[in-house]
Amino acid sequence: MFYIHGNPSASICGRVLLLFFLLFSHAVHAQYSVSANDDNAIKWRQIQTKSFRLVYPDFYEADAQKLARVLDTVSLHIGNSLGTTAPRIPVLIHTNGSKSNGLLVWAPKRMEFWTTPPPDHYAYPWSWQLALHEYRHVCQMQALNKGITKCLNAVFGEHILGAVSGLLVPLWFMEGDAVVAETAMSPTGRGHTPEYKMLFKAQLLEKGAYKFDKAKLGSRRDYIPNQYVFGYYMTAFSRSIYGRDVFADVMESTAKHWWRGAWFSKAGKRPYSDSRVYEQMADSLLRVWETERKQWLEKENKSAIEEIEIRKRHYTNYKNPIQIGQDSIIALQSSSFGLQTLVLITKGKVHKLRSLPYLKHSYFDYKDGKVLYSQESANQRWGQQNNADIIEYDFRKKKYRLVTSDAIFFNPVYNPVDKNIIAAIETDRKDNQSLVILSPGNKFLYTKNVLQKNKHQYIASIGKENDVAFSFPCWSEDGKALYVIETSVYGKCIAKYDIATGKRSLLTASSYDDISRLQIRNGRLYFIKDVKGKYELVSMSLESGACTVESDTEYGISSYCITETPFHDDETGNHSDETVKERNGNVDLILSAYNSDGFRLVRSKAMALPVDLNEPNPEPLFVSDLRKEEGFILDASFMNDTTVAYESKPYSKPAHLFNFHSWAPFFMNVTKQDLGIGVSFFSQNLLSTSVLQFGYKYNPQDIKHELYLTYNYSGFYPIFDVETNYKMRSMLLSSDTTDLYAQWNEWMSGLNMTLPYTWNTQRTVNKVSLVANYSFRKLVPRKLINPHEEFRILDLFNTFGLGFRLSMLSAQAYNDIVPSWGEVIKLNYKTTLTSNPAEYFSFSSTTYVPFIFKNQ
C-alpha cells in the first residue's frame, strides 16, 4: 500500500495525465476502423444536408433519395431522450453484397450501412431499422461531447470521443440504448419481438440471475444473453424507475467529470449504479415471468412435448429439423464451442455430416438425400462485394455441387414435383428482390468459370414488388405456385404468386407481428408467428382461410418439421374444414423449442386451436411507456409525403482522398501498436482506400529525432504501401583501443505493392498475395570523430524484393483462439542494387492441426 501526499491540485493533475495517457493508449490498441473496399469501378454520388452527407453508388439513386428522407426525419427526433441533437456525419452505403449490417465508428467518424435486406429480419424495413439504431449511436457519442471531453475532442480530434466511449461507457448501454430507440420509435423493433424476451426469460427462470460482472461481460463457458439483449432490458428498466432522461444526465456527467472518477456507473446528479439496477431488474422480471410460467403450466391447452434425448455438454442449438425415414432427423447444430454443422440424429445419437460455417441464415432445404442452401462467397479482391451462392450437398455421396455463382441468392427450396427445379430469392445491386425459378437440372457444374452469370438456368423471375423484401418461399403442393413472406413499410404479409401468369394474391393482411418459415402440407400453410409474445406454429387453411395455433411451448420455437400420419382426402379430393380438423389431430410435429440450454428438438402433436391473426398481441414490458416518452414513430405514414427531393452530386474520389480526423501529442504507430514520445497526425478517407499517418518521434537512444510517414492506398486492384522516415542519428562506441563518435542523417523510403486474391471453400478462407517492394536508404554524415582509423560509410543503399503469401485457414468457432486446421506460408527474396550485391531469402510456415484439447 502506498500514499501520495502533497498539493491536491497536483494530485488532480496527475490523475488527468494518467487518464489522458490511458485514452491515447486505448486509441492505439483499439486501432482505427478501416473497412474493406468496394469495387473500384463504382462511381459514387452524394446527398448533403445539415445532418449528414450520404455517399452511395450512382446506380442506387432512387433508394438513396428514400433513405435520405428517412435519415433527415430521424435526425430531428433520435437524440431527444439523450438531451442532444444529432451532429452532422458522413453515411456510406454498401450495396451489391450479401452482408446485412450497420456500423458506427468515430475515428474517423462515419456510419456505414450494408443495405441488402436479410430474410430473417423482423417485420420492418431493413434500412429504416439501420437508420434508427445507428443514428442513436451517433447521438450517444454526441452526448459525450461536453465539458472537458469536448475540449479534448476539439483539440486532438475524433479519436478522443471514441476512446472515452470505449473506456468509460459500457457496451451494454451503447447497444441496449440503441435497441430501445429502434423499439420506441418504430411500430416494432427487436425489443418488441419475442426473441429478446425468450432468451432472457429462460435464463432467469432456469439458471437464475448471474452475478453482474458475468451478465455484463459475458462468458465463454455459459450462455449469457448478449449486449443487445442484456442492454435492452437494463436500459429500459433504468428508464422505468429513473425517468426518460436518466442517461442524458449520466452521459453528461461522464463527459464533464470523468477525470474526477465520475465514470458511467458513478455519474449523474443522483449517482447511477448499474449493479444495483441489475439486481432490481432481475428481481422484477423474475416475478413477472414466474407468474407467466405459472399461468402457462395451469393451461389445459398447451403443447405436450416429448424431448428427443440428445446429450449436451454445453449450450447448443438444434434448428431446421427435417425427418428422413422413420427414426432419423437432419438438423443444423451450432454452439460457441463448434462450427455450424449439419448433423444426422438417430435414436438420440448425433452424427456430424458436414460443417457449414458459411451457410446463410441457418436455413437449408432437403430432398432425396441432398440438402440445398445459400452460402457466403468471398470476392477475389473487393471485400464489400461478397456473394451468396446456392450449393447442393449430397451427404450420402459426400459431394458438393455449385448451382449458382456471382450473384446473391437466399432461401433456396426444391420444387416438390420436379427436383430439378428450385426457387430462391435473388437480390440485385440496387437491393431489389425477386422470386426466381431456376432449372439447373442434372447439369450441375463444379467450376465457377463455366457458370459465371447463372445464364441458361432461369425459367422465370416473378414478384418484383417495389419496396418489398422477400423471405422463406415455399412451393404449392402441385409445384405451380410460390408462397412467400413480404416485408414492407406496413410490416409482413404472406402472398401467393402463380408462376405461369405472375399473378399475385394476398393471404394475410400486413402486420408488424413477425412471421417466418413457410411450409405447405395437405392444403394448409404453416408458418411461425408472434402469438401473445412467443414464436409459435400457426397454420392456415388454403381453402377457407381459417387459422389455428399448432403449438404452445413455454418460451417459443425457431423452426419445425411436419411429420403427419398419412391422411387421405375425401372423394372430391378437397380439404374441407371438417377433414382438416380431423387431420390436424393426426399431425405430428418436430419443434425446435427453446430453453436455457439452447434450442432443443421435441416431438409434439398439432393443437389445432382457432386463432384470429388480426387480433393484436399484448405489448411487451416497457414498450408502451418508451414510445410515449419518445413521442415519435417512424411508420408507413411517413411515406405519404413524396414531394421531398434532395440534390444529388457526383462524389469525387480524388477530392476526398484525405480526411485529417485526429492527432496526438504522442508518437502512435497504429499498425505496429507502438507508443512513444513525439506527435502524430492521422487521415483516413470515407471509402477506407486512403490511410495516412505522419509525425515526429523522439528516441532517447541512438535515434534522437525522427520524422515519419506511412501511407496505404487500396483503391486499385494492387494495394500500395509507402513508408518513409528521416532520422537524425548518433552513435558512440568505446573500447580500450579506440573511441568512435558519429552523427549522421538517415533517409529511408520504401514502396510495397501487393496483388491479393481471396476465395473460400465450404470450410476455409484462402488468401494468396504476390508482393513486390523497393527501398532505399541514404546516409548524410554530419560528424565523425575517430583519431585512429578512417571509416568508409555506405551512403546509398537500394534493395528490391519479391514475396509470396499463402494462407488456408479453417473457419473458427466463437470460442476458438486459432483455427483448428490451416497453413500459412511466407516466402521472401531480397537483393541489393549496389556494386557489391547481397541476397536474402527467407521461408516460414505455420501449420495448425487439432490437438487433444481444443484451442479454446
Per-region residue spans from a language model:
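Transmembrane beta-strand segments of outer-membrane beta-barrel domains in Gram-negative
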Residues: E723-N855
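Juxtacatalytic substrate-recognition/specificity segment
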Residues: A30-V164, P170
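Outer-membrane beta-barrel initiation region
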Residues: E298, H314, N320, K605-Y717, ...
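Acidic/His/Gly-enriched intrinsically disordered linker/tail segments
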Residues: V34-D39, P108, P125-L130, V138, ...
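A short beta-strand motif characteristic of beta-propeller blades
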Residues: I305-K312, K349-S355, K398-T404, F444-N449, ...
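Hydrophobic beta-strand positions that form the internal "hydrophobic ladder"
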Residues: I329-I330, V371, I421-I422, L482, ...
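A flexible loop/linker signature enriched in serine peptidases of the S9 family
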Residues: G191, Y315, Q333-L342, R354-H361, ...
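Beta/coil-rich, acidic/histidine-enriched accessory regions frequently appended to metallopeptidases
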Residues: S35-D38, K43-Q46, D222-P225, V250-Y363, ...
